[in-house]
């Protein structure tokens, strides 16, 4: 007897085997796929409620991507030794899975739906994120849930002028492009990328190369669905025709007038008044409602979108009165906070970001622990979106998925422009506080971050700016919108964010909600985005054009020196005793790397100098003939022991204390005296021989050869 009815599809994809299997694991889920690529394995499951919860007027879709430590043969750290709250990476991959599948559910589908993807094995070569996107799409396609997929996904790298599909984790480290693209058989739905100043044509080529590369994956999912898919659920959507006619009659003219108001708050008030009028007429407080409330609300929202779209396509005029290419007025300011290492205020229309850069040392690096292992991150960018930025009162707390996603988008835009650790050995943290928002706060963060970093003296390769674009498509007509408002973001068919320098693109993010947007439209859109980006860079240059020559007054200074690797142990000392003493006595922070690189940091230059001299005294040997400052540590009958060069002790014989005959050591020096000594050499037991007589104790001048030789006693 066979317990399982297993169906599988296997294809060769970008040089590795992709296996999609269903029927053995998680059989009570609506859809479940056990997927393997190389030796990376994920389980994707889909469950969608059979009915809609009362009062739900949106599509409650949640995507949870989770990495299990056992997948890489590891035990989680921390006290509890088990997986805890989602990491930043898990949150970002959850968003990556969510974005291309969300637009493919029918409008009006309100059943709570949950996609859970669990990484079960990781071969440390094939990133599980692409496999998770493919497996989620396959699970949805098999589930019977109304889903207009399947979706494919691929990662594209750009190496030596060639596109490489699904590079390994090692290959991604050295590429000029790391781009993820997802879509259906005939449309691109999502792009997420980081690039090293690539042209619009190279970026678009990567998108199209990725799209064509995952077509065999979509075909495999369709073949699997033909064998194993569940019966499609009946989806009965209400007929909106009557409601649309009624709402249009009441609201069209008033909505058109409301959307001519350029101020966001006033416009919202006018739209709310129109909505209240519609609800008052169609859903009277007394008597019977003419239509269901949620249906009226949905149709009213649709009409809002149509009014804005009609106005743009018919007249070329947008909500705030701009034409399609105009960027809102920009004001860039730097150095606005007195004690910050670097700060900027970037205002574009009704969107504003206060961005602050802080410099730290190696010990401030973030330790990141994921399936690939543990690594240290020296560039941190945190994006905060407080509710007051949109004139609302709301929850404050730890960052949500959106804030993490927007922060990472800005991080990708700035990261390729950072100096190397050798050029600039600082840990860098940028915090963006969105103080006003009406569209494209993530791109305001990119601009503000670039300004704040330059204000802090970080030598960026070039200033970076970002712009959010929108697109409206009706049949053959389309309009590309530069610098979109918040309202235009969710009323359009495509929104995409492009960040980069005057030389090229560093980050591209696209979300496309409909089919029919082809390569040519994307090319026009990217060209218009470049115009906007260059305009914004010009406005930013009015505030600052490059990194300041000096670091901020309150930023730590870091100086670097190299010591022999065999001396590292001596500088650190038993249990860290020596390095701890240096830090405590000098006030400097010290970081020693395995190759002997030592970074000494402090906001006080004298503190750095003292620490470096101390380290040098331990790590380098004193040279014969050199003159050193020293301290008398012990007085004996035959001379004085002097501590010099930090931690070295040597003997000044009584005959080398001063000119002429010295009867008693204590006649010349006593313990604690500061003296100048010349290193004469070493005796046959390796002990250090010093002279005070050959050094002018006032000036430190070398007196050797300027006086007759004098024999040491006992010679």
From Swiss-Prot:
- State the GO CC annotations: cytosol
Provide the reaction this enzyme catalyses: RNA(n+1) + phosphate = RNA(n) + a ribonucleoside 5'-diphosphate
Supply the InterPro entries for this chain.
ExoRNase_PH_dom1, ExoRNase_PH_dom2, ExoRNase_PH_dom2_sf, KH_dom, KH_dom_type_1, KH_dom_type_1_sf, NA-bd_OB-fold, PNPase
Task: Indicate the family of this protein.
Answer: Belongs to the polyribonucleotide nucleotidyltransferase family.
Q: Which residues form a coiled coil?
A: none
A family per Pfam = RNase_PH
Entry EC number(s): 2.7.7.8
Cellular location(s): Cytoplasm
Residues engaged in binding Mg(2+): 489, 495
Tell me the gene name: pnp
Q: What does this protein do?
A: Involved in mRNA degradation. Catalyzes the phosphorolysis of single-stranded polyribonucleotides processively in the 3'- to 5'-direction.
KH domain sequence ranges: 556-615
Q: What GO terms are given for molecular function?
A: 3'-5'-RNA exonuclease activity; magnesium ion binding; polyribonucleotide nucleotidyltransferase activity; RNA binding
What are the S1 motif domain coordinates in residue numbering? 625-693
Cofactor(s) needed by this chain: Mg(2+)
Which biological process annotations from GO are given for this protein?
mRNA catabolic process; RNA processing
What NCBIfam families has UniProt attached to this entry? polynuc_phos, PRK11824.1
Keyword annotations of the record: Cytoplasm, Magnesium, Metal-binding, Nucleotidyltransferase, RNA-binding, Transferase
Please give the name of this protein: Polyribonucleotide nucleotidyltransferase
Main localization category: cytoplasm
């Amino acid at each position: 007897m066979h317990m399982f009815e297993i169906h599988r599809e296997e294809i060769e994809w970008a040089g590795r085997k992709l296996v999609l299997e269903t029927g053995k694991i998680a059989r009570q889920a609506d859809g479940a796929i056990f997927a393997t690529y190389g030796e990376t394995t994920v389980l994707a499951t889909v469950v969608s409620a059979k009915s809609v919860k009362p009062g739900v007027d949106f599509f409650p879709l949640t995507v949870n991507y989770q990495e299990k430590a056992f997948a890489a043969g590891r035990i989680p750290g921390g006290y509890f030794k088990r997986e805890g709250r989602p990491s930043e990476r898990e949150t970002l991959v959850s968003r990556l899975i969510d974005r291309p599948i969300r637009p493919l559910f029918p409008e009006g589908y309100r059943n709570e739906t949950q996609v859970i993807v669990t990484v079960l094995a990781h071969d440390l070569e094939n990133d599980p994120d692409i496999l998770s996107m493919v497996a989620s799409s396959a699970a949805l396609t098999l589930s019977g849930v109304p889903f207009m997929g399947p979706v494919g996904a691929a990662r594209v790298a750009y190496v030596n002028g060639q596109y490489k599909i699904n590079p390994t984790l090692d290959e991604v480290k050295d590429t000029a492009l790391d781009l993820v693209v997802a879509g259906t058989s005939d449309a691109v739905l999502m792009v997420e990328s980081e690039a090293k100043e690539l042209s619009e044509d190279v970026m678009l080529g990567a998108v199209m190369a990725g799209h064509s590369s995952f077509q065999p994956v979509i075909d495999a999912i369709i073949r699997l669905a033909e064998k194993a898919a569940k019966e499609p659920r009946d989806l009965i959507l209400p007929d909106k025709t009557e409601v649309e006619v009624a709402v249009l009659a009441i609201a069209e003219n008033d909505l058109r007038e409301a959307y001519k108001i350029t101020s966001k708050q006033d416009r919202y008030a006018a739209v709310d008044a129109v909505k209240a009028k519609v609800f008052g007429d169609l859903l009277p407080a007394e008597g019977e409602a003419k239509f269901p409330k949620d249906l009226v609300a949905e149709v009213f929202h649709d009409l809002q979108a149509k009014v804005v779209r009609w106005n743009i396509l018919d007249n070329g005029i947008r909500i705030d009165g701009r034409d399609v290419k105009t960027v809102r007025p920009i004001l860039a300011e730097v150095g606005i906070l007195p004690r910050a290492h670097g700060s900027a205020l970037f205002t574009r229309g009704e969107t504003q970001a206060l961005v602050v850069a802080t410099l730290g040392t190696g010990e401030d690096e973030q330790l990141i622990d994921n399936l690939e292992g543990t690594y240290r991150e020296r560039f941190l960018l945190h994006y905060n979106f407080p509710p007051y930025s949109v004139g609302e009162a709301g929850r404050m707390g730890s960052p949500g998925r959106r804030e993490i996603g927007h922060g990472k988008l800005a991080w990708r835009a700035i990261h390729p422009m950072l100096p190397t650790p050798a050029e600039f050995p600082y840990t860098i943290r940028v915090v963006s506080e969105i103080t006003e928002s009406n569209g494209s706060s993530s791109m305001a963060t990119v601009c503000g971050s670039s300004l704040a970093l330059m204000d802090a003296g970080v030598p960026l390769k070039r200033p970076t700016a970002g712009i959010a674009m929108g697109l409206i498509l009706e049949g053959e007509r389309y309009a590309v919108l530069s610098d979109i408002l918040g309202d235009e973001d969710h009323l359009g068919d495509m929104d995409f964010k492009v960040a980069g320098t005057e030389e090229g693109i560093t980050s591209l993010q696209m979300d496309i909600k409909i089919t029919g947007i082809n390569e040519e439209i994307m090319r026009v859109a990217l060209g218009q985005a470049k115009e906007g980006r260059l305009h914004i860079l010009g406005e930013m240059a009015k505030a600052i054009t490059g990194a300041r020559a000096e670091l901020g007054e309150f930023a730590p200074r870091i100086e670097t020196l190299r010591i022999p690797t065999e001396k590292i142990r001596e500088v650190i000392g038993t249990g860290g005793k020596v390095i701890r003493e240096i830090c405590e006595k000098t006030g400097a922070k010290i970081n020693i790397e395995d190759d002997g690189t030592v970074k000494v940091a402090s906001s006080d230059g004298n503190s750095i100098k003292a620490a470096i001299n101390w380290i040098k005294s331990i790590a380098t040997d004193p040279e014969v003939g050199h003159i050193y400052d020293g301290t008398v540590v012990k007085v004996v009958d035959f001379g004085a022991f002097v501590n010099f060069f930090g931690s070295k002790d040597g003997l000044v014989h009584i005959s080398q204390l001063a000119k002429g005959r010295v009867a008693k050591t204590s006649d010349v020096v006593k313990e604690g005296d500061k003296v100048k000594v010349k290193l004469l050499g070493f005796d046959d037991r390796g002990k250090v021989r010093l002279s005070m007589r050959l050094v002018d104790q006032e000036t430190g001048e070398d007196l050797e050869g300027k006086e007759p030789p004098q024999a040491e006693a006992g010679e």
